[in-house]
């Protein structure tokens, strides 16, 4: 997946216009390449994992600033470690999840036929993230969206402004 530029808007109209522009870019990117391969999905998930690991301390500090003062250990256990584990679990099962699934066929009407279903990516997935556990709730959705081959747009809570600025 190609990177889509990220900008921070300030007013409501500016935010709406920016989101519409990002959605337009996401749609164009999706229609240009609607079926990411296993390697592309794996690369996206590894980038997500690397981002979390490389920016762990900055994320913890931003969340603490948003909460007023949140325990570093709580953030590490409830947010960082669970997301990293989620990526690792998804990577472990991704190839199996991408395989076409067998479905039954009416033997009377279609004798000898075989049926398979390969769920396609849906396109762009939107996530509106609440203020509590913002990394866990946003990145868990991103993990699932990327594993399914989708693109994603995330709208962080206004109460998570330090973290939103970091992301």
Please state what every model-predicted region is.
Residues 1-115:
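N-terminal Rossmann-like NAD(P)+-binding subdomain of aldehyde/semialdehyde dehydrogenases
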Residues 106-167:
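Rossmann-like NAD(P) dinucleotide-binding subdomain of oxidoreductase/dehydrogenase enzymes
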């Amino acid at each position: 997946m190609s990177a889509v530029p990220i900008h921070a808007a300030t007013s409501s109209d500016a935010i709406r216009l920016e989101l519409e522009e990002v959605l337009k870019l996401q749609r164009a990117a999706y229609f240009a390449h609607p079926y990411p391969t296993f390697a592309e999905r794996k690369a996206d998930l590894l980038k997500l994992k690397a981002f979390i690991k490389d920016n762990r301390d900055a994320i913890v500090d931003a969340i603490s600033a948003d909460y007023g003062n949140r325990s570093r250990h709580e953030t590490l256990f409830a947010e960082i470690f669970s997301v990293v584990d989620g990526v690792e679990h998804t990577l472990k099962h991704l190839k199996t999840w991408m395989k076409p699934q067998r479905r039954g066929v009416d033997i009377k009407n279609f004798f000898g036929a075989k049926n398979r279903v390969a769920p396609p990516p849906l396109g762009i997935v939107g996530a509106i993230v609440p203020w509590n556990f913002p990394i866990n709730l946003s990145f868990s959705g991103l993990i699932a969206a990327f594993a399914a081959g989708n693109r994603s747009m995330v709208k962080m809570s206004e109460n998570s402004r330090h973290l939103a600025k970091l992301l």
